[in-house]
């Protein structure tokens, strides 16, 4: 059988129905590609307690997707390790990492795939991501979290001057997000890249459990001398926070309990420290690192203190 052109990897944890909706959107909007085997779909389940694995097995029995694989990761091993499990069984020349709470619109995958095929200097690309209300998800359009960018973001300077090159470096707010252009980093909710590039960087860094891994992924691609591109001319819907439960807008649909949310919040702030140690430790004075880590600890304590059982 001819190898697929694109492997679509969806990592799921406790978001059964959202994942099924995401898969259905692919089957509906790309019926020719999935029926012919040009696109393959790989669903990795991180030991979800909500019956996801069985539901995916049932979906496989009735789907018309020619190549549909279900992978049991064997445990809740995190975002990076879970996606790497999917890579091991992927056969496509290109790979798309897609969050389970994402709905892919018609023509988006085709346009994004065509773009990266014709731009060999681009290592990875994302489309515009919006939530259910059409609100822009800036995570698909970011600068790297340098000490200055991070300070401006958490201090509120970025909100005060959202289009400033000086103060809005993390969100890159001076760029027109309705156009296609280069950015530092895109969101792990939608990342498409050539498999050969992923092989060169060793795929996802498993030192990250949840959060931060997409920034590291993009940073590693930059180190190859390649660009990261954002395509504002095509879009997908990303609900966001469905698995983590840390976003207020999606707390009504998350199945995460208070202990799981605490774990995820801790992983989020730990990821900030990991990224700094890996990429900025030797670029800035030790005193600055101590100051930054103290600030991260304060932010973590505030986030944990704000958690309430609804």
Positions of the model-derived regions?
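N-proximal low-complexity "stem/linker" segments adjacent to membrane-targeting elements
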Residues: 1-28, 32-37
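Acidic donor-binding segment of Leloir-type glycosyltransferases
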Residues: 24-75, 85
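Glycine-rich, basic loop-to-helix element that forms the pyrophosphate-binding segment
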Residues: 72-90, 111
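Short aromatic/hydrophobic "clamp" motif used to bind/position activated sugar donors
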Residues: 95
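Conserved donor NDP-sugar-binding/catalytic core segment of glycosyltransferases
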Residues: 103-141
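Short, flexible, basic/aromatic active-site loop/helix in glycosyltransferases
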Residues: 144-183
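A short, conserved alpha-helix in the catalytic core of glycosyltransferases
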Residues: 176-237
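Active-site-adjacent helix/loop segment of glycosyltransferases
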Residues: 219-309
